[in-house]
Amino acid sequence: KIENGELDITISNLMKIARKYGVSTEELIFAEAPHMKSYYVTRKGQGMSIERTKAYKYQSLVGGFVNHKADVFIVTVEPKPGARTIYKNTHPGQEFNLVLEGAMELYIGGKTMVLEEGDSIYFDSSKPHGMLAVGEKPVKFLAFTVE
């Protein structure tokens, strides 16, 4: 179903596949290995774009750094008027989110909360978690994951 475009693959599943085969997530997605070893600069708006669904857009901020220990993304999520179902996800490690613009309803391990611009959260990402954009405008947040 994924190969036929009937089903989207989540970024966490891409990360699992990459780990299993010993490659970076970026190498799996873009068929290009990272090459920077000392530092990697990402200019504003120039992150490696990863778009798996129309609602979620990821920009990798560390994609060109060899053997990076953390994944850092700017994530933009479009609001879905009337949507109440939050798709839940798990992956090994921990995650930090900082809301840059807009607001999100975040579900983590049985609890739901609203985070607004400037709010942040650090959590165990092995617990089921997911989110929705709240309001009429997209939410943009910094997502930092590490195992």
Please state what every model-predicted region is:
Residues 1-9:
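Recognition helix of helix-turn-helix/homeodomain-like DNA-binding domains
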Residues 56-57, 68, 116, 125-147:
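Ligand-binding loop in jelly-roll beta-barrel domains
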Residues 61, 109-125:
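Short acidic-glycine-tyrosine-enriched beta hairpin
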